[in-house]
Amino acid sequence: MQNINRRRFVTTSLALGAAGIASPALIGRAKAAAMKMRLSSSLPDDPKYANGRVLYDNLVKHIKADGLGEQIEVAFFPSNQLGQEIDVINSVKLGVIDMMVSGSSISANIVPIVGAYDLGYMFDSFPQQTKAFDNGAAKPVEDALLKNANIRVIAWAYNFGSRSVLSKKAVHGPADLAGAKIRTLPNPIITECLRLMGAAATPMAFGEIYTALQAGVLDGVEHDPPTILASKFYETSKFYSLTQHNFSPLAV
């Protein structure tokens, strides 16, 4: 994992996001009655491991700092309480759920251009990714999400680490992945990346991973270290091989 000031990046991003939420039209609405919003995350309610909780805490802090704490209420729903991510992103598109925190890969299911960030080994680090975003790489994706899905990105953030492979045996090269059923996001680009690395890439909803690993339906999973810890996937598979094949960003 790269040594980066993730919390400062998240705080800055959400300051901008809170400013966007607190637009004149919304403030007018908020004066009439408290606006209640829901924020969904697939990960547990634990700021040590779960990026969604960190982003939620910073969002609430900035809403209060803008003097809107009594007018805008944001409720946090961790651990897929509002549904699997693929269902939640469609609910956000329809306006049924207000916000979600997820890797950009989930949005690629409804607006394919977002999947450009999921290309294997596209970035070497999160600082490199941030530099690209600061120089305009994020704008085409933001515009496409707004135009094609009515979804506005209010913040980009670092994930808690690059994605690597957790499996029942160590991975030193493609030969070690040959035929191994490795869970991937339901995203064609990430699935193809793992296939090219030698694995039998197996798309699966996040909430099904633990039992599939436990039952031997899967041989492994690719994810970032804190997600592995928060979800206790290490209880089923003992080898975490730092393939670092993906540095996809988080989006709110």
PLM regions and their residue ranges:
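N-terminal secretory/targeting leader peptides
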Residues: 2-129, 137, 143-252
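Short, flexible helix/strand-to-coil boundary loops that buttress conserved ligand/catalytic motifs
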Residues: 133
